From Swiss-Prot:
Keyword NAD among record annotations: no
Gene that produces this protein: thrB
Keywords assigned: Amino-acid biosynthesis, ATP-binding, Kinase, Nucleotide-binding, Threonine biosynthesis, Transferase
CDD domains (alphabetical): HomoserineK_II (cd05153)
Pathway assignment: Amino-acid biosynthesis; L-threonine biosynthesis; L-threonine from L-aspartate: step 4/5
Designated name of the protein: Homoserine kinase
Species name: Paraburkholderia phytofirmans (strain DSM 17436 / LMG 22146 / PsJN) (Burkholderia phytofirmans)
MF terms in GO: ATP binding; homoserine kinase activity
Phylogenetic classification of the source organism: Bacteria, Pseudomonadati, Pseudomonadota, Betaproteobacteria, Burkholderiales
Length: 331
């Protein structure tokens, strides 16, 4: 979400003339992230986020925006894309597709506790179930085919144990993806990037008995149809880890997984392959961060993430230490 593409005041005025969202009060770039150009937009009608898509094409974009509209209609708290005067959910700005969505209430919780993980686990399961009847389809663009394509471009920059791990884990995941158990895993639309900075929390009402309230999930632009367990693994690998070591925190992990399965119970196949999917979730982000680190794009406010973080997480998932895991009635 770094600002790769700047927007001038006259350009913004012309863009906003195609919306019925009132007059612009404030407009500023968002510096976090590395994929799209994002801006906070406040008008006399409300608060929004303007996104210019740096990689996604106009052909790909309807999947993401229509999914967000579908989830919002099913009472899942997500940003709702705003239609233009012609009814379209996106247009063209600087020759790139761009859209405006509603801004969620609250702020990210960068040091989540058990209660935050419970809220996220329940809502993630609700989101998965709400997406079952979504008719759009887009594969997870950062899954195995992308790993196969990208890893050879990264390997020349690595040596020794790093190089060996990147290659050996790809082979492990190829075998896992080809298995009958993998094929049997439940699937559907997934967020696929549900890190702690992609959710908002607000203060809960005093009469609820809770300290926090989930404001919603956002940044769906890595979403795709994939195994739901992959989405859970990606989420756990961020929300439930010690950031310094990559080790899973038992209390947060158990809280998130138990909360998730109160809404959607895990299957026996999911239970068997929880460890494999935790590795897949870590590998996906190690590969993408290595790629962004060694093959960066020029950007106005680029802040690349440390690839070593997910290398540590992947190595932790390989240690053989008993992991906090999922539970099914088959145990």
């Amino acid at each position: 979400m770094a600002v790769f593409t700047a927007v001038t005041e006259p350009q913004l005025a012309e863009w906003m003339s195609h919306y019925d969202l009132g007059d612009v009060v404030e407009f500023r770039g968002i510096s976090s992230g590395i994929e799209n150009s994002n801006f906070f937009l406040t008008t006399t009608r409300g608060e929004y986020v303007l996104t210019i898509f740096e990689k996604l094409t106009a052909e790909q974009l309807p999947f993401y925006l229509d999914l967000m509209r579908h989830l919002a209609a099913h009472r899942v708290p997500v940003p709702d894309p705003m239609p233009r005067e012609d009814g379209a959910l996106f247009g063209t700005l600087h020759g790139k597709p761009a859209a405006i969505v509603t801004k969620l209430e609250g702020a990210p919780e960068l040091a989540p506790g058990v209660e935050h993980c419970i809220e996220v686990g329940q809502m993630l399961a609700r989101m998965h179930l709400a997406g079952r009847d979504y008719t759009g389809y887009q594969p997870n663009l950062r899954s195995l085919p992308w790993w196969r394509e990208t890893v050879p471009t990264i390997l020349p920059f690595l040596q020794g144990e790093q190089r060996e791990l990147l290659s050996s884990e790809l082979a492990h995941q190829e075998a896992f993806f080809a298995s009958a158990d993998y094929a049997a895993l439940p699937e559907g639309p997934c967020h696929a990037d549900l890190f702690r900075d992609n959710a908002m929390f607000a203060h809960a009402a005093p009469d609820t008995g809770h300290e926090v309230r989930l404001g919603g999930f956002f940044d769906f632009y890595f979403a795709g149809c994939d195994k739901w367990l992959f989405d859970v693994a990606v989420t756990v690998n961020d929300w439930c880890v010690d950031l310094a070591t990559g080790k899973l925190d038992n209390a947060r992990t158990e809280a998130m997984l138990r909360a998730y399965q109160t809404v959607r119970p895990f299957t026996a196949e999911e239970n068997r392959h929880w460890g494999d999917m935790l590795r897949a979730g870590a590998y996906r982000f190690w590969v993408s961060r290595l790629y962004d680190f060694y093959l960066p794009r020029a950007a106005e406010l680029l802040k690349p993430h440390d690839p070593g973080h997910f290398e540590r997480i992947l190595r932790e998932r390989l240690t053989g230490v008993a992991l906090p895991g999922i539970h099914t009635s088959c145990n």
